[in-house]
Swiss-Prot record:
Glycosylation positions in this chain: T23
Protein name per the record: Interleukin-2
Annotated source species: Cercocebus atys (Sooty mangabey)
Highest taxon in the source lineage: Eukaryota
Keyword annotations of the record: Adaptive immunity, Cytokine, Disulfide bond, Glycoprotein, Growth factor, Immunity, Secreted, Signal
Main subcellular location of this protein, as a coarse class: secreted
Subcellular localization: Secreted
Length: 154
């Protein structure tokens, strides 16, 4: 009789361990995706902050919307909504002295990662802050967001 309970207990324990295993793997996957997003955002920021960028002052005139609060992955919806304007500003700023390699690919990569991280079911309506941000502030805030989420996962 006790043997049957013990076997049931072992079976349930194995089921729990098996079912919980993907969670740790998905946390690792989320962390890796956030790290890739972070690197892409930093690459854009480094290209903009390059001392040889003659169009930086022009780029700073464009304003981007920032969410009032960005603390969860679902808030990446707000970043996704600003990717098209970001790409347009980066394309305007291209010159022979300043060229972000594969701007379209970078934006595409960011978009794919954002879609995977926030999930396709997210229909969050972004609540934007009253004040807008320059391209540098915009990128810095999203970089900080990624770093913050990564730190909670580790």
């Amino acid at each position: 009789m006790y043997r049957m309970q013990l076997l049931s207990c072992i079976a349930l324990s194995l089921a729990l361990v098996t079912n919980s295993a993907p969670t740790s793997r998905s946390t690792k996957k989320t962390q890796l995706q956030l790290e890739h997003l972070l690197l892409d955002l930093q690459m854009i920021l480094n290209g903009i902050n390059n001392y040889k960028n003659p169009k930086l002052t022009r780029m700073l005139t464009f304003k981007f919307y920032m969410p009032k609060k960005a603390t969860e992955l679902k808030h990446l919806q707000c970043l996704e909504e600003e990717l098209k304007p970001l790409e347009e500003v980066l394309n305007l700023a291209q010159s022979k002295n300043f060229h972000l390699r594969d701007t379209k690919d970078l934006i595409s990569n960011i978009n794919v990662i954002v879609l995977e991280l926030k999930g396709s079911e997210t229909t969050l309506m972004c609540e934007y802050a009253d004040e807008t941000a320059t391209i540098v502030e915009f990128l810095n805030r999203w970089i900080t967001f990624c770093q913050s989420i990564i730190s909670t996962l580790t």
